[in-house]
Every structure is written in C-alpha cells, then in structure tokens.
C-alpha cells in the first residue's frame, strides 16, 4: 500500500517548480491533491499530467494567497469535493529579489509579507479544524535567505523567518490536537533557476562551488520525497523542526 493512499493534500503554488515536484511525489504515494496558484492554464496542465501519470484526483483552484476570502473558497471547495484535509503545504511565495535592504520600498516588503506569512497564516487558521480531525500535518516553506542572511533578499528573508516563527508556535499550540507543523528550507533547480544558469553561467558555477554536494535539489526526488516523509506516519514524532535541504551549503549546528 502506498504511504499516503487516499489522503488529501493542499499545495499552494502547485502548478510549477518546487510545488509541482512536491505534487508529483505525493501523487506517487497515492494522495489526491488540491493545487492552487494564480495561472489557471498552468494548474490545468498540472492536473492533466498528474491524473494521467498517477491515477489520482486533482482539484485545481485559482487563488491569491494574500486574499483571505480566496483562501476560504479553496478550503470550501476542497471539503465539498474530498471531505477532508490531511496535509497543508504552504509553498507559494512572491517577492522582489536582488535589491539591497536600503533600496527596498514598503511595497516590496508588503509583497513578500502578504504572499508569504499572511498566506500561511490564513491557510493554517482555516485548515485547523479539518487537520485536527485527521491528525494531519502542515509543511511550511522557508528559505536559506533568512537562515543565513543572504544579500539582496531582505523582504523575502523577513517573510520566510516570520513563517518559521509562526510554525514553531503552531507546533506548540497544535501538538495537543495531533497536528504536526514543520518547515522546509529548499535549494532546488527550478525553471527560473535554469534560466539564470543559462544567462549567468559563471555565477552559477561559483554558486555550485559553495554547495558541498555540488548540485541543486531535484524538486520531486529531493524536496518532494522529504515532504512525503514529513506528512507520513514515519514522521509521527517530528514537529516544530526546520529541515534544511541545501546540499550542505550554510552548515549550521
């Protein structure tokens, strides 16, 4: 039997990149999926591919994570179709990267905060009663940008570190409800990173040299399968943790 047979997993930003890799990993273990994002065509394409390849059901919903009402609608549709929620994965995030802190505007900070920590906050609150029923789990995505203070990432890092703090408190408060809350900090090869590699090959090679394993993570195999573990019974005693999937870069105690 597959580890997540007939589970229901919500993945924000599930139509591309890391989110789609996670979707593939969960589908391979038998979980039905709810994929959210801002581009309908991308979500529909993801649904068709996943259902054809893995034989699971996928509900695609266009939703902006900064819109609380849109998130309420996502959960309403999820319960109407599947009747339960086992895992919530807050993966989506929008931000302006590459700007020094002194060049960030309030609008830049708002963009990161609303699409990041507010989205995670809204989703977690509305999913709580359903996760309590299933003794489910939350997997929130943060970043090495905050953990290691990477230049040019101040608004993004602020949002991601806020998500880590929110997650630790939720792990404490929701433990008695049987809900586990963990954080993943990935360093994965995505579509945008592939473009960056092509446009800046020398900078890419310099970056790779700082990763002891010598590569970026694969979204499905290196990120998605760890998320499957965190959502499964194998991780039943794991909560409040930050899992750094960075290939050894930024080693910390």
Where are these regions (language model features)?
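Short, small/polar-rich loop/turn modules that mediate ligand/substrate recognition or access, typified
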Residues: 175, 180, 238-240
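Active-site helix of classical SDR
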Residues: 124, 159, 167
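Conserved glycine-rich cofactor-binding loop
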Residues: 13-17
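Residue(s) in the substrate-gating loop at a strand-loop-helix junction
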Residues: 143
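Short C-terminal tail/terminal secondary-structure segment
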Residues: 98, 148, 239-253
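Substrate-binding pocket helix/loop in short-chain dehydrogenase/reductase
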Residues: 99-101, 105-113, 207
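Catalytic Tyr-x(3-8)-Lys segment
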Residues: 202-221
């Amino acid at each position: 039997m597959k580890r997540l047979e007939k589970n229901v997993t919500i993945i924000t930003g599930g139509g591309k990149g890391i989110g789609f890799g996670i979707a593939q990993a969960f589908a391979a273990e038998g979980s039905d999926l709810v994929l959210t994002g801002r581009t309908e065509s991308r979500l529909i394409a993801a649904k068709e591919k996943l259902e054809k390849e893995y034989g699971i059901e996928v509900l695609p919903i266009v939703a902006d994570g900064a819109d609380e009402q849109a998130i309420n609608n996502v959960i309403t549709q999820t319960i109407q179709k599947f009747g339960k929620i086992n895992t919530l994965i807050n993966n989506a995030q929008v931000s302006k990267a590459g700007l020094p802190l002194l060049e960030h505007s309030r609008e830049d900070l708002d963009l990161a905060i609303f699409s990041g920590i507010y989205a995670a906050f809204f989703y977690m609150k509305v999913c709580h009663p359903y996760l309590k029923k299933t003794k489910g789990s939350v997997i929130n995505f943060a970043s090495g940008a905050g953990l290691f203070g990477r230049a040019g990432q101040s608004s993004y890092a602020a949002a991601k570190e806020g998500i880590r703090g929110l997650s630790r408190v939720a792990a404490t408060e929701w433990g008695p409800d049987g809900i586990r809350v963990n954080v993943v900090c990935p360093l994965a090869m995505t579509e945008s990173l592939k473009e960056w590699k092509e446009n800046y090959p020398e900078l890419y090679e310099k970056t790779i040299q700082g990763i002891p394993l010598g590569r970026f993570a694969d979204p499905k195999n290196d990120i998605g399968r760890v998320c499957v573990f965190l959502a499964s019974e194998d991780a039943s005693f794991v909560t409040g943790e930050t899992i750094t999937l960075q290939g050894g870069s930024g080693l910390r105690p």
